[in-house]
C-alpha cells in the first residue's frame, strides 16, 4: 500500500481504507486515497468485480471531506463502518480479505 500507515477494514457494510492525519489531514487524505485506489485495482483484477473502497482519515476533531476522502471523527468511526446497509455477503468478504492478505504478502 501507499506507505504502510493505512489499514484496510472489510465487512458486510463495505471496504474502507483508514489512516491517521499524519503529518496533516491533506497529506493523509492523498495517501489514503491512493491506497484505496490500489486496493480496489487489485481486487477488480482478481475478482472481476470489487466494492468501492472508501478512503477515510480518522481524526480527533471535527469531520468533513478533503477532495474525495472522508474525514471522520474517531468517536464516530465504529458506527460509520458497522451501521448501514449490508452490501457484501460473508463469502465475498472472505474472498476480499483473502485477496488483500495475498497481495500484502507480495508487497
Predicted features along the sequence, with ranges:
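Surface-exposed interaction regions that form or flank ligand-binding interfaces
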Residues: 1-3, 12-13, 20-107
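Short beta-strand scaffold segments in enzyme catalytic cores
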Residues: 7-9
Amino acid at each position: 500500500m501507499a506507505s504502510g500507515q493505512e489499514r484496510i477494514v472489510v465487512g458486510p457494510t463495505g471496504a474502507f481504507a483508514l489512516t491517521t492525519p499524519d503529518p496533516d489531514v491533506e497529506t493523509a487524505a492523498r495517501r489514503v486515497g491512493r491506497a484505496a485506489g490500489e486496493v480496489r485495482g487489485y481486487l477488480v483484477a482478481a475478482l472481476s468485480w470489487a466494492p468501492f473502497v472508501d478512503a477515510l482519515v480518522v481524526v480527533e476533531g471535527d469531520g468533513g471531506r478533503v477532495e474525495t476522502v472522508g474525514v471522520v471523527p474517531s468517536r464516530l468511526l465504529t458506527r460509520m463502518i458497522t451501521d448501514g446497509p449490508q452490501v457484501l455477503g460473508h463469502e465475498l468478504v472472505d474472498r476480499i480479505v483473502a485477496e488483500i492478505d495475498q497481495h500484502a504478502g507480495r508487497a
